[in-house]
């Protein structure tokens, strides 16, 4: 689907090359930016190249690159407000880990979906996540259209269990170009140091 956003205030994030903002148009073709311009001739050329393009009037709106959340545990949206103002290790050992031990994979997906929708509504288009059942969180990423770097998390996990988790993640979403995988520590103090070595 081709889109053309017109009459928007564009914040291109290239201040050293261009003015900080300008009024113009942004064209999208084949899921890629194909036009960022205030030149009426280039905007009209985009229309001719893409007959039937869907136009969206951005008058009074700002168009900018999506924000990136570089550290989150998106499924923990369900735990917001559960235990606040507590020292980290007490918070983890006495509240969070016991709570998480009771969670089902479906509840983790629900928390992830809520967190992803919240991020999208706030302009976040990419996030880096580290949590349990990332292969299931990847399903939510696929459904909701956001980009993600999902971290295979480990805490008291054997190398074999960790490798199985990574294989599940890749099998679940290996063909989705919006998802990347990485290795991330979930906790400041994994008790099994062999995996981190």
Annotate each predicted stretch with a short phrase.
Residues 1-47:
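N-terminal metal-binding scaffold of metallo-dependent hydrolase/deaminase domains
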Residues 8, 26, 31, 60, ...:
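Divalent metal-coordination and catalytic microenvironments
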Residues 19-20, 49, 175-180:
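Short helix-terminating capping/connector loops at secondary-structure junctions
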Residues 78-110, 117, 144-152:
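Active-site gating loops and adjacent loop-to-helix segments of metal-dependent hydrolytic enzymes
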Residues 126-184:
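Mid-domain alpha/beta scaffold segments of enzyme catalytic cores
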Residues 185-192:
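Conserved small/polar residues in nucleotide/adenosyl-binding loops
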Residues 196-197:
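Hydrophobic alpha-helical segments, chiefly the membrane-spanning helices
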């Amino acid at each position: 689907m081709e889109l053309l956003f017109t009459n928007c205030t564009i914040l291109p994030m290239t201040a050293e090359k261009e003015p900080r903002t300008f009024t113009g148009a942004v064209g999208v073709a084949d899921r890629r930016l194909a036009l960022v311009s205030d030149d009426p001739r280039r905007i009209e050329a985009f229309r001719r190249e893409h007959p039937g393009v869907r136009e969206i009037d951005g008058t009074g709106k700002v168009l900018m690159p999506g924000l990136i959340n570089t550290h989150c545990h998106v499924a923990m949206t369900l735990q917001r407000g559960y235990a606040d103002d507590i020292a980290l290790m007490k918070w983890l050992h006495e509240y969070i880990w016991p709570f998480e031990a009771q969670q089902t994979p479906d509840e983790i997906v629900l928390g992830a979906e809520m967190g992803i929708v919240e991020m999208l509504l706030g302009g976040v288009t990419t996030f880096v996540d580290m949590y349990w059942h990332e292969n299931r969180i990847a399903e939510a990423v696929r459904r909701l259209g956001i980009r993600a770097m999902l971290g295979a998390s480990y805490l008291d996990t054997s190398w074999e269990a960790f490798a199985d988790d990574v294989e599940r993640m890749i099998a679940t979403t290996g063909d989705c170009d919006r998802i990347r995988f990485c290795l991330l520590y979930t906790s400041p103090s994994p008790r099994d140091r062999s995996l981190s070595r």
